[in-house]
Protein backbone atom coordinates (compact mmCIF):
# COMPACT_ATOMS: atom_id res chain seq x y z
CA UNK A 1 0.00 0.00 0.00
CA UNK A 2 1.42 3.41 -0.96
CA UNK A 3 1.98 6.22 1.54
CA UNK A 4 -0.74 8.20 -0.23
CA UNK A 5 -3.22 5.33 0.18
CA UNK A 6 -2.25 4.83 3.83
CA UNK A 7 -2.81 8.50 4.59
CA UNK A 8 -6.11 8.46 2.72
CA UNK A 9 -7.40 5.63 4.94
CA UNK A 10 -6.35 7.20 8.22
CA UNK A 11 -9.07 8.65 10.46
CA UNK A 12 -9.65 12.36 9.90
CA UNK A 13 -8.80 13.13 13.53
CA UNK A 14 -5.20 11.96 13.01
CA UNK A 15 -4.79 14.32 10.05
CA UNK A 16 -7.10 17.29 10.59
CA UNK A 17 -6.95 19.85 13.38
CA UNK A 18 -9.47 22.40 14.63
CA UNK A 19 -8.01 25.32 12.68
CA UNK A 20 -8.94 23.58 9.44
CA UNK A 21 -12.63 24.20 10.13
CA UNK A 22 -12.41 27.85 11.16
CA UNK A 23 -12.61 29.49 7.74
CA UNK A 24 -15.87 30.26 5.97
CA UNK A 25 -16.71 28.19 2.89
CA UNK A 26 -19.50 30.56 1.94
CA UNK A 27 -22.95 29.21 1.25
CA UNK A 28 -21.78 25.62 0.97
CA UNK A 29 -21.18 25.43 4.75
CA UNK A 30 -18.63 22.72 3.99
CA UNK A 31 -16.44 23.55 6.99
CA UNK A 32 -19.40 22.81 9.30
CA UNK A 33 -20.07 19.48 7.57
CA UNK A 34 -16.37 18.56 7.67
CA UNK A 35 -16.13 19.46 11.35
CA UNK A 36 -19.06 17.19 12.16
CA UNK A 37 -17.53 14.38 10.11
CA UNK A 38 -14.26 14.88 12.03
CA UNK A 39 -16.11 14.81 15.36
CA UNK A 40 -18.15 11.74 14.38
CA UNK A 41 -14.98 9.82 13.52
CA UNK A 42 -13.47 10.66 16.92
CA UNK A 43 -16.63 9.42 18.64
CA UNK A 44 -16.73 6.24 16.54
CA UNK A 45 -13.10 5.52 17.47
CA UNK A 46 -13.99 6.10 21.15
CA UNK A 47 -11.33 8.81 21.54
CA UNK A 48 -13.73 11.66 22.37
CA UNK A 49 -13.04 13.05 25.86
CA UNK A 50 -14.49 16.56 25.47
CA UNK A 51 -17.86 17.51 26.96
CA UNK A 52 -17.79 14.42 29.18
CA UNK A 53 -20.67 14.66 31.69
CA UNK A 54 -19.66 14.59 35.35
CA UNK A 55 -21.80 12.49 37.67
CA UNK A 56 -20.29 13.92 40.87
CA UNK A 57 -19.10 17.35 42.13
CA UNK A 58 -15.71 18.83 41.18
CA UNK A 59 -13.68 17.14 43.91
CA UNK A 60 -10.22 15.53 43.47
CA UNK A 61 -11.95 12.24 42.66
CA UNK A 62 -14.84 12.26 40.17
CA UNK A 63 -17.12 9.94 38.23
CA UNK A 64 -17.78 10.67 34.56
CA UNK A 65 -19.80 9.07 31.78
CA UNK A 66 -18.16 8.96 28.38
CA UNK A 67 -20.10 9.36 25.19
CA UNK A 68 -20.74 5.64 24.67
CA UNK A 69 -22.11 5.26 28.19
CA UNK A 70 -19.13 3.76 30.04
CA UNK A 71 -18.46 5.27 33.47
CA UNK A 72 -14.97 6.08 34.77
CA UNK A 73 -13.62 6.93 38.22
CA UNK A 74 -10.92 9.56 37.72
CA UNK A 75 -8.47 11.66 39.68
CA UNK A 76 -9.41 15.19 38.72
CA UNK A 77 -6.71 17.56 37.47
CA UNK A 78 -8.94 19.40 34.99
CA UNK A 79 -11.00 21.52 37.39
CA UNK A 80 -10.03 24.99 38.60
CA UNK A 81 -11.85 24.53 41.90
CA UNK A 82 -8.51 25.60 43.36
CA UNK A 83 -9.47 25.96 47.03
CA UNK A 84 -12.32 23.46 47.13
CA UNK A 85 -14.99 26.09 47.81
CA UNK A 86 -17.33 24.74 45.11
CA UNK A 87 -18.05 21.86 47.51
CA UNK A 88 -17.45 23.49 50.89
CA UNK A 89 -20.45 22.82 53.18
CA UNK A 90 -20.64 26.42 54.42
CA UNK A 91 -20.55 27.74 50.85
CA UNK A 92 -23.26 25.29 49.79
CA UNK A 93 -25.43 26.27 52.76
CA UNK A 94 -25.01 29.98 52.00
CA UNK A 95 -26.11 29.34 48.42
CA UNK A 96 -29.16 27.40 49.66
CA UNK A 97 -30.08 30.21 52.03
CA UNK A 98 -29.86 32.78 49.22
CA UNK A 99 -31.93 30.50 46.98
CA UNK A 100 -34.66 30.32 49.63
CA UNK A 101 -34.60 34.09 50.16
CA UNK A 102 -34.27 35.42 46.60
CA UNK A 103 -35.33 32.58 44.29
CA UNK A 104 -33.57 30.88 41.41
CA UNK A 105 -32.55 33.69 39.06
CA UNK A 106 -32.14 37.46 39.03
CA UNK A 107 -34.41 37.65 35.93
CA UNK A 108 -33.24 41.12 34.99
CA UNK A 109 -30.33 43.28 33.91
CA UNK A 110 -28.32 44.63 36.86
CA UNK A 111 -28.95 48.15 35.56
CA UNK A 112 -32.72 47.69 35.53
CA UNK A 113 -34.40 45.29 37.96
CA UNK A 114 -31.82 42.49 38.40
CA UNK A 115 -29.81 43.88 41.31
CA UNK A 116 -30.56 42.23 44.66
CA UNK A 117 -29.43 43.17 48.14
CA UNK A 118 -27.04 40.22 48.13
CA UNK A 119 -25.30 41.62 45.03
CA UNK A 120 -24.61 44.90 46.86
CA UNK A 121 -23.29 42.94 49.85
CA UNK A 122 -20.84 41.10 47.60
CA UNK A 123 -19.72 44.34 45.93
CA UNK A 124 -19.11 45.91 49.35
CA UNK A 125 -17.31 42.82 50.67
CA UNK A 126 -14.95 42.74 47.68
CA UNK A 127 -14.29 46.47 47.95
CA UNK A 128 -13.47 46.09 51.65
CA UNK A 129 -11.31 43.05 50.87
CA UNK A 130 -9.04 45.17 48.67
CA UNK A 131 -9.29 48.05 51.14
CA UNK A 132 -8.53 51.13 49.03
CA UNK A 133 -10.52 54.29 49.69
CA UNK A 134 -12.56 55.64 46.76
CA UNK A 135 -12.73 52.30 44.95
CA UNK A 136 -15.64 50.02 44.09
CA UNK A 137 -16.66 46.78 42.40
CA UNK A 138 -18.97 45.90 39.53
CA UNK A 139 -20.30 42.36 39.07
CA UNK A 140 -20.64 40.46 35.79
CA UNK A 141 -22.36 37.17 35.02
CA UNK A 142 -19.10 35.66 33.71
CA UNK A 143 -15.37 36.31 33.89
CA UNK A 144 -15.31 36.38 30.09
CA UNK A 145 -18.01 39.04 30.14
CA UNK A 146 -16.07 41.09 32.68
CA UNK A 147 -13.01 41.34 30.44
CA UNK A 148 -15.01 41.96 27.27
CA UNK A 149 -17.20 44.59 28.94
CA UNK A 150 -14.43 46.42 30.76
CA UNK A 151 -12.00 46.65 27.84
CA UNK A 152 -14.67 47.59 25.28
CA UNK A 153 -16.21 50.29 27.49
CA UNK A 154 -12.89 51.84 28.56
CA UNK A 155 -11.30 51.95 25.10
CA UNK A 156 -12.87 53.72 22.13
CA UNK A 157 -12.06 54.19 18.46
CA UNK A 158 -8.71 55.95 18.18
CA UNK A 159 -7.45 54.61 21.53
CA UNK A 160 -4.96 51.77 22.01
CA UNK A 161 -5.17 48.35 23.67
CA UNK A 162 -1.77 46.74 24.24
CA UNK A 163 -1.94 43.01 24.92
CA UNK A 164 0.55 40.38 26.02
CA UNK A 165 0.98 37.71 23.33
CA UNK A 166 -0.38 35.12 25.80
CA UNK A 167 -3.55 37.08 26.61
CA UNK A 168 -6.79 35.22 27.23
CA UNK A 169 -9.40 35.20 24.46
CA UNK A 170 -11.71 37.43 26.51
CA UNK A 171 -9.14 40.25 26.54
CA UNK A 172 -8.57 39.85 22.81
CA UNK A 173 -12.31 39.87 22.11
CA UNK A 174 -12.82 42.93 24.30
CA UNK A 175 -10.03 44.71 22.44
CA UNK A 176 -11.57 43.89 19.04
CA UNK A 177 -15.04 44.95 20.21
CA UNK A 178 -13.66 48.28 21.47
CA UNK A 179 -12.65 49.30 17.92
CA UNK A 180 -9.40 50.61 19.36
CA UNK A 181 -6.05 49.88 17.75
CA UNK A 182 -4.59 46.62 19.09
CA UNK A 183 -0.87 46.14 19.69
CA UNK A 184 0.83 42.96 20.94
CA UNK A 185 4.04 42.64 22.94
CA UNK A 186 6.21 39.58 23.50
CA UNK A 187 5.09 37.61 26.55
CA UNK A 188 6.15 39.30 29.80
CA UNK A 189 8.75 41.41 27.95
CA UNK A 190 8.86 44.90 29.48
CA UNK A 191 11.47 46.15 26.98
CA UNK A 192 9.26 45.13 24.06
CA UNK A 193 6.29 46.85 25.73
CA UNK A 194 8.35 50.01 26.22
CA UNK A 195 9.18 50.21 22.51
CA UNK A 196 5.46 50.13 21.70
CA UNK A 197 4.47 52.65 24.37
CA UNK A 198 7.28 55.04 23.51
CA UNK A 199 5.96 55.25 19.96
CA UNK A 200 2.20 55.44 20.55
CA UNK A 201 2.25 57.62 23.68
CA UNK A 202 3.14 60.66 21.54
CA UNK A 203 -0.39 60.66 20.09
CA UNK A 204 -2.07 61.65 23.37
CA UNK A 205 -4.62 58.84 23.02
CA UNK A 206 -5.85 56.62 25.84
CA UNK A 207 -3.73 53.48 26.21
CA UNK A 208 -4.72 50.36 28.14
CA UNK A 209 -2.11 47.68 28.82
CA UNK A 210 -3.67 44.29 29.67
CA UNK A 211 -1.74 41.59 31.53
CA UNK A 212 -2.59 38.62 33.74
CA UNK A 213 -1.69 37.69 37.30
CA UNK A 214 -1.13 34.04 36.40
CA UNK A 215 -1.36 32.94 32.77
CA UNK A 216 -3.95 30.24 32.20
CA UNK A 217 -1.96 28.05 29.81
CA UNK A 218 1.69 28.85 30.64
CA UNK A 219 1.16 28.91 34.41
CA UNK A 220 3.71 31.67 34.94
CA UNK A 221 3.17 34.95 36.78
CA UNK A 222 2.77 38.18 34.89
CA UNK A 223 5.93 40.29 35.12
CA UNK A 224 3.92 42.89 37.00
CA UNK A 225 6.67 44.96 38.61
CA UNK A 226 8.35 45.81 35.32
CA UNK A 227 5.22 45.96 33.15
CA UNK A 228 3.40 48.28 35.55
CA UNK A 229 6.45 50.54 35.86
CA UNK A 230 6.81 50.86 32.08
CA UNK A 231 3.08 51.47 31.62
CA UNK A 232 3.07 54.27 34.19
CA UNK A 233 6.19 55.83 32.68
CA UNK A 234 4.28 56.43 29.44
CA UNK A 235 0.93 57.39 30.94
CA UNK A 236 -0.82 54.13 30.08
CA UNK A 237 -3.57 52.61 32.22
CA UNK A 238 -3.06 49.00 33.25
CA UNK A 239 -5.49 46.13 33.70
CA UNK A 240 -4.54 42.95 35.56
CA UNK A 241 -6.71 39.88 35.02
CA UNK A 242 -6.52 37.86 38.25
CA UNK A 243 -8.71 34.96 37.05
CA UNK A 244 -6.20 32.30 38.12
CA UNK A 245 -4.54 34.17 41.00
CA UNK A 246 -7.27 35.84 43.08
CA UNK A 247 -7.60 34.33 46.60
CA UNK A 248 -4.36 32.36 46.07
CA UNK A 249 -1.46 34.71 45.30
CA UNK A 250 -0.40 37.32 47.84
CA UNK A 251 -0.17 37.02 51.61
CA UNK A 252 -3.90 37.63 52.11
CA UNK A 253 -5.10 36.33 48.73
CA UNK A 254 -5.52 39.65 46.94
CA UNK A 255 -3.75 38.14 43.96
CA UNK A 256 -0.62 38.87 41.98
CA UNK A 257 -1.12 42.61 42.52
CA UNK A 258 -0.50 41.95 46.21
CA UNK A 259 2.25 39.38 45.57
CA UNK A 260 4.24 42.00 43.62
CA UNK A 261 3.06 45.02 45.62
CA UNK A 262 1.51 46.93 42.70
CA UNK A 263 -2.15 47.17 43.76
CA UNK A 264 -2.01 50.94 44.29
CA UNK A 265 -0.54 51.45 40.79
CA UNK A 266 -3.01 49.28 38.85
CA UNK A 267 -6.10 50.92 37.33
CA UNK A 268 -8.35 47.89 36.79
CA UNK A 269 -8.34 44.48 38.48
CA UNK A 270 -10.48 41.72 36.97
CA UNK A 271 -11.64 38.85 39.16
CA UNK A 272 -13.34 35.59 38.23
CA UNK A 273 -15.71 33.67 40.52
CA UNK A 274 -15.55 30.34 38.68
CA UNK A 275 -12.12 29.37 39.95
CA UNK A 276 -10.92 29.99 43.52
CA UNK A 277 -14.42 31.07 44.62
CA UNK A 278 -15.98 27.88 43.24
CA UNK A 279 -18.96 29.62 41.60
CA UNK A 280 -19.49 31.50 38.35
CA UNK A 281 -19.25 35.13 37.31
CA UNK A 282 -16.72 37.93 37.34
CA UNK A 283 -16.00 41.40 38.64
CA UNK A 284 -13.91 44.50 38.12
CA UNK A 285 -12.30 46.52 40.90
CA UNK A 286 -11.44 50.14 40.10
CA UNK A 287 -11.98 53.72 41.22
CA UNK A 288 -15.63 54.34 42.04
CA UNK A 289 -16.22 56.90 39.28
CA UNK A 290 -14.94 54.40 36.71
CA UNK A 291 -17.16 51.66 38.17
CA UNK A 292 -20.19 53.96 37.89
CA UNK A 293 -19.37 54.58 34.22
CA UNK A 294 -18.82 50.91 33.34
CA UNK A 295 -22.06 49.87 35.00
CA UNK A 296 -23.81 51.66 32.12
CA UNK A 297 -21.34 51.27 29.24
CA UNK A 298 -20.09 47.68 29.62
CA UNK A 299 -22.45 46.01 27.16
CA UNK A 300 -21.80 42.50 28.52
CA UNK A 301 -23.19 43.72 31.86
CA UNK A 302 -25.96 46.02 30.65
CA UNK A 303 -27.39 43.42 28.26
CA UNK A 304 -26.95 40.31 30.43
CA UNK A 305 -28.95 39.01 33.36
CA UNK A 306 -27.43 39.71 36.76
CA UNK A 307 -25.64 36.98 38.72
CA UNK A 308 -27.87 34.24 40.14
CA UNK A 309 -28.67 35.14 43.78
CA UNK A 310 -27.84 31.63 45.04
CA UNK A 311 -24.42 31.66 43.39
CA UNK A 312 -23.84 35.16 44.77
CA UNK A 313 -24.59 33.91 48.28
CA UNK A 314 -22.06 31.11 47.87
CA UNK A 315 -19.41 33.48 46.51
CA UNK A 316 -19.93 35.82 49.46
CA UNK A 317 -19.31 32.96 51.90
CA UNK A 318 -16.26 31.75 49.93
CA UNK A 319 -14.78 35.25 50.16
CA UNK A 320 -15.39 35.33 53.91
CA UNK A 321 -13.64 31.97 54.36
CA UNK A 322 -10.76 32.81 52.02
CA UNK A 323 -10.06 36.10 53.81
CA UNK A 324 -9.59 34.27 57.13
CA UNK A 325 -7.60 31.36 58.61
CA UNK A 326 -9.24 28.84 56.27
CA UNK A 327 -7.90 30.74 53.29
CA UNK A 328 -4.43 30.98 54.84
CA UNK A 329 -4.29 27.20 55.24
CA UNK A 330 -5.58 26.51 51.74
CA UNK A 331 -3.16 29.00 50.14
CA UNK A 332 -0.25 27.32 51.91
CA UNK A 333 -1.41 23.87 50.83
CA UNK A 334 -2.01 24.66 47.15
CA UNK A 335 1.42 26.27 46.81
CA UNK A 336 3.07 23.27 48.50
CA UNK A 337 1.15 20.87 46.25
CA UNK A 338 2.08 22.78 43.09
CA UNK A 339 5.75 22.97 44.07
CA UNK A 340 5.75 19.23 44.78
CA UNK A 341 4.19 18.25 41.44
CA UNK A 342 6.56 20.49 39.49
CA UNK A 343 9.50 18.88 41.31
CA UNK A 344 8.29 15.44 40.18
CA UNK A 345 7.85 16.51 36.55
CA UNK A 346 10.87 18.72 35.91
CA UNK A 347 13.63 17.02 33.89
CA UNK A 348 11.09 14.36 32.83
CA UNK A 349 8.66 16.40 30.70
CA UNK A 350 8.56 19.97 29.41
CA UNK A 351 6.52 22.11 31.83
CA UNK A 352 7.60 25.38 30.23
CA UNK A 353 7.83 28.38 32.54
CA UNK A 354 5.17 27.33 35.07
CA UNK A 355 5.53 28.96 38.49
CA UNK A 356 2.06 28.27 39.85
CA UNK A 357 -0.79 25.80 40.35
CA UNK A 358 -1.33 25.80 36.58
CA UNK A 359 1.12 23.24 35.20
CA UNK A 360 1.27 22.60 31.44
CA UNK A 361 2.99 19.59 29.95
CA UNK A 362 3.93 20.55 26.41
CA UNK A 363 3.65 17.78 23.80
CA UNK A 364 3.40 19.97 20.69
CA UNK A 365 1.80 17.98 17.85
CA UNK A 366 -1.94 18.53 18.15
CA UNK A 367 -2.67 15.38 16.16
CA UNK A 368 -1.71 13.51 19.33
CA UNK A 369 -4.28 15.41 21.38
CA UNK A 370 -7.29 13.13 21.09
CA UNK A 371 -5.54 9.76 21.50
CA UNK A 372 -3.49 11.23 24.35
CA UNK A 373 -6.54 12.51 26.23
CA UNK A 374 -8.18 9.10 25.86
CA UNK A 375 -5.02 7.33 27.04
CA UNK A 376 -4.76 9.44 30.20
CA UNK A 377 -8.43 8.95 30.99
CA UNK A 378 -8.00 5.18 30.73
CA UNK A 379 -5.09 5.49 33.15
CA UNK A 380 -7.59 7.04 35.59
CA UNK A 381 -6.80 10.76 35.27
CA UNK A 382 -8.73 13.72 33.93
CA UNK A 383 -6.66 16.54 32.44
CA UNK A 384 -7.41 19.44 30.10
CA UNK A 385 -6.00 18.69 26.65
CA UNK A 386 -5.50 22.04 24.96
CA UNK A 387 -4.79 22.58 21.29
CA UNK A 388 -5.22 25.41 18.81
CA UNK A 389 -6.95 27.86 19.10
CA UNK A 390 -6.60 27.67 22.91
CA UNK A 391 -2.81 27.55 22.45
CA UNK A 392 -0.47 28.36 19.56
CA UNK A 393 -0.20 25.98 16.61
CA UNK A 394 1.90 22.91 17.40
CA UNK A 395 2.21 23.96 21.05
CA UNK A 396 -0.50 21.65 22.41
CA UNK A 397 -0.44 20.92 26.12
CA UNK A 398 -1.81 18.69 28.83
CA UNK A 399 -2.87 21.17 31.50
CA UNK A 400 -2.93 20.08 35.12
CA UNK A 401 -4.71 22.23 37.69
CA UNK A 402 -3.37 21.62 41.18
CA UNK A 403 -5.70 22.34 44.10
CA UNK A 404 -5.37 22.65 47.85
CA UNK A 405 -7.44 19.47 48.14
CA UNK A 406 -5.16 17.06 46.26
CA UNK A 407 -3.31 14.47 48.35
CA UNK A 408 0.35 13.50 47.99
CA UNK A 409 -0.73 10.12 46.62
CA UNK A 410 -2.83 11.80 43.94
CA UNK A 411 0.05 14.07 42.97
CA UNK A 412 2.42 11.08 42.79
CA UNK A 413 -0.07 9.26 40.57
CA UNK A 414 -0.48 12.33 38.37
CA UNK A 415 3.27 12.58 37.76
CA UNK A 416 3.53 8.85 37.09
CA UNK A 417 0.71 8.98 34.52
CA UNK A 418 2.13 12.02 32.72
CA UNK A 419 5.64 10.58 32.56
CA UNK A 420 4.29 7.22 31.31
CA UNK A 421 2.23 9.00 28.64
CA UNK A 422 5.24 11.08 27.58
CA UNK A 423 7.15 7.89 26.80
CA UNK A 424 4.18 6.26 25.08
CA UNK A 425 3.56 9.31 22.88
CA UNK A 426 7.21 10.32 22.52
CA UNK A 427 7.34 13.76 24.14
CA UNK A 428 9.53 12.97 27.15
CA UNK A 429 12.75 14.90 27.68
Give, region by region, the residue ranges found by the protein language model.
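N-terminal "arm"/small-domain region of PLP-dependent enzymes with the aminotransferase-like
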Residues: 2-22, 26, 31-104, 236
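Conserved PLP-binding catalytic core of the aspartate aminotransferase-like
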Residues: 18, 330-339, 348-379, 390, ...
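PLP-dependent aminotransferase class I/II
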Residues: 276-343, 349-352
Amino acid sequence: MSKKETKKNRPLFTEFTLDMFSRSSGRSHSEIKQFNQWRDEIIEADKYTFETPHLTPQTPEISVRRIHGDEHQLVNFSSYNYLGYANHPEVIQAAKDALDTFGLGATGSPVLNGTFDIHKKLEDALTNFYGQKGYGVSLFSSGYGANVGVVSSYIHKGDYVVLDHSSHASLIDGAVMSQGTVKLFRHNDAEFLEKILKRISKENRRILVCVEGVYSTDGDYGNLKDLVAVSKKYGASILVDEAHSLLIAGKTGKGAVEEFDVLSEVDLVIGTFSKSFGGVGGCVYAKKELINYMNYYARSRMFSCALDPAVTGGILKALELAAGPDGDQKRKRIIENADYLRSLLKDKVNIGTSQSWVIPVIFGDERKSLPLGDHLMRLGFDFSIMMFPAVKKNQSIIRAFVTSEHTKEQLDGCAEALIQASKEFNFNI
